[in-house]
């Protein structure tokens, strides 16, 4: 499983939090985090920046990788839904890559290729915090599927 995320200069607290959840994961459920440089915020339009980031993400995709795009307009999901989806994908041998877009969002062509578009809620979260929330939710989903006591509803 991988997370492709736009942006490379994150505050130290983001890296520390993501690393903390990553080290808790067992090897067979390791998550690879791939940072993709954000498009330069010049006079270009948001659409052209998203297109450039989309092309960079496309170049980083692996064969047979299925995309799950995190998007404000995506389906609002529960942790249990995430856990069930991940268990199903693992059982079916689906290689999954989560995508966190840049400040302008995710290009429509990338959204169209996704097997799922999920929202972490209807609140607006800064991109660094989305990384931390996703890292924690991936760990929590694993804990549900593994019967680990971390998750208490």
PLM ranges: what are they?
Residues 108-152:
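Structured adenosyl-cofactor binding patch, chiefly the S-adenosyl-L-methionine
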Residues 15, 19-22, 51-54, 108:
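Short, surface-exposed alpha-helical segments at coil->helix boundaries
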Residues 1-25:
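N-terminal beta1-alpha1 ligand-phosphate binding loop
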Residues 3, 68, 101, 134:
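Conserved RecA-like P-loop NTPase ATPase core
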Residues 4-6, 34, 99:
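Short hydrophobic segments within beta-strands
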Residues 84-124:
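A mid-sequence interfacial segment
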Residues 29-97:
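S-adenosyl-L-methionine/SAH cofactor-binding core of RNA-modifying enzymes
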Residues 9, 72-75, 102-105:
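Short glycine-rich anion-binding loops that position phosphate/pyrophosphate groups of nucleotides
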């Amino acid at each position: 499983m991988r997370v492709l995320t736009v942006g490379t200069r994150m505050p130290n607290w983001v890296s520390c939090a993501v690393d903390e959840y990553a080290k808790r994961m067992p090897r067979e459920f390791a998550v690879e985090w791939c940072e993709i440089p954000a498009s330069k915020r010049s006079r270009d339009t948001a659409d052209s920046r998203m297109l450039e980031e989309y092309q960079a993400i496309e170049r980083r995709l692996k064969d047979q990788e299925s995309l799950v795009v995190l998007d404000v307009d995506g389906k609002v999901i529960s942790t249990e839904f995430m856990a069930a989806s991940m268990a199903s994908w693992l059982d079916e041998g689906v290689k999954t890559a989560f995508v966190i877009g840049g400040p302008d969002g995710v290009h429509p062509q990338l959204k169209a290729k996704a097997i799922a578009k999920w929202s972490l809620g209807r609140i607006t979260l800064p991109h660094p915090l989305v990384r931390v929330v996703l890292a924690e939710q991936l760990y929590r989903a694993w804990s549900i599927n593994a019967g680990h006591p971390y998750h208490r509803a």
